[in-house]
UniProtKB/Swiss-Prot annotation:
Complexes and interactors: Part of the 30S ribosomal subunit. Forms a tight complex with proteins S10 and S14.
Species of the source: Acaryochloris marina (strain MBIC 11017)
This protein's record includes keyword Ribosomal protein: yes
Gene3D superfamilies associated with the record: 3.30.300.20, Ribosomal protein S3, C-terminal domain
Entry GO terms, CC: cytosolic small ribosomal subunit
Protein name as annotated: Small ribosomal subunit protein uS3
Record-linked SUPFAM superfamilies: Prokaryotic type KH domain (KH-domain type II), Ribosomal protein S3 C-terminal domain
Length: 241
């Protein structure tokens, strides 16, 4: 089951939290849900060069609180806060009212350990027609330098322009999808290339969350685990040259 279900939805309330935190009456729920969809689309579209890792939405009465997690907070804030003000005005026009919107910008501590940013990086390289094997290898190396416990990347579609679509994946370290206490960061993105659509999936294992304690990486039986990783490891060969 852990291999098929969405890793984030599988762990809601355990290691993952909801990206939208508000309550509403039954009649207003669809309207507010569509507003959340519009807000996230607007932020991701207009701040595509800021490395947006996620947008958390909270509602208090008629006020909307946004928490924008980004790799480049200076791009979002702008000079003298002009970026935030223009973003607020644009969101009010998108929603069609003048409700107060409070925006809090949070910098991502480890950029190369965020599944969303890793997937965005791979998509950008695939659109530039870089070999997918080379891109995946570079992304894994950057994630390992960032200190992740494990990472798995899958790319599917007409890889390198092949006539028959296929999917290939590689994994480094542990990615325990069946373990509920495992903090798994997951993201899915699509790349529009001249040969068609390529799907990119990224799983990042950041350690196990022990109840009543901070997030801790598991270091039990390192030698045995290393031997298992060597047996299960699958390397991409770069045949683009």
């Amino acid at each position: 089951m852990g291999q098929k279900i969405h890793p984030t939805g599988f762990r809601l309330g355990i290691t993952q939290d909801h990206w939208s935190r508000w309550f509403a009456d039954t009649d207003r729920y669809p309207e507010l849900l569509q507003e959340d969809f519009k807000v996230r689309n607007y932020v991701n579209k207009n701040l595509s060069n800021a490395g947006i890792a996620g947008v958390r939405i909270e509602r208090k009465a008629d006020q909307i609180d946004l928490e924008v997690r980004t790799a480049r907070p200076g791009v979002v804030v702008g000079r003298g806060g002009s970026g935030i003000e223009s973003l607020r005005v644009g969101l009010q026009k998108e929603l069609g009212d003048d409700r107060p919107i409070r925006i809090n910008v949070v910098e991502v501590a480890r950029v190369d350990a965020e599944a969303t940013l890793i997937a965005e990086y791979i998509v950008q390289q695939l659109v530039r027609r870089v070999s997918f094997r080379r891109v995946v290898r570079q992304a894994i190396q950057r994630a390992q330098r960032a200190g992740v416990e494990g990472i798995k990347i899958q790319v599917g579609g007409r890889l390198n322009g092949a006539e028959i679509a296929r999917s290939e994946w590689t994994r480094e370290g542990r990615v325990p999808l069946h373990t509920l206490r495992a903090n798994i960061d997951y993201s899915y993105r699509t790349a529009s290339t001249t040969y068609g659509i390529l799907g990119v999936k990224v799983w990042v294992f950041k350690g196990e969350v022990i109840p009543g304690a901070d997030e801790q990486p598991t270091n039990r039986e390192p030698q045995q685990r290393r031997r298992q990783q060597q047996r299960r490891r699958q390397q991409f060969e770069d045949r683009s040259e």
